[in-house]
Amino acid sequence: MNASRCDLLRRQFDLTWSLFEYHLERLDTEDFLWRPTPLCWTVHLRADGRWMPDWSETEPDPVPVPTIGWLSWHIDWWWSTTIELHLGRRPRDREDIAWPGDAEGAIGRLRELREEWLGVLDDLDDAALDAASPSPWGQGPDHTVAHTAAWVNAELMKNVAEIGQLRMVRAASSG
């Protein structure tokens, strides 16, 4: 049996998402806002009623530990940007992407992004994978849709592992 590149990318994505669902089903709002250490990046309720993330244009040293809330905002930012660019639309500025404010909203948003991305994946064939892919991160003209899809899988897998680890550490430390 010879699986296509599209099938491999989709199966890898589905595996990553199934691991994510394991954690999403167990999260509550307190988990999203739990600070595992004093040096954290999290989300904050601003006076205008929007939840916005900590951010620095240059990576701090040491790097702050992100909260689940910050990570879920981060996923929304990079994934929505990737989807919008792939669909030929102008993505929102990072500063325009707010965290939803609670577990239900954050989990709902992540599941919306999954559905949008599945629409992208399901429209791909091997020829489409070889097309140039626009990217806000400047990978250059040799960057293909296949590279982008593989990167989404890897970045999501990393973020899922981070969220899962934070959730398990919080659960173990409170019990």
Where are these regions (language model features)?
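Short, contiguous alpha-helical
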Residues: 3-96, 134-175
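Acidic/histidine-rich alpha-helical segments that form the ligand environment
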Residues: 98-130, 147-157
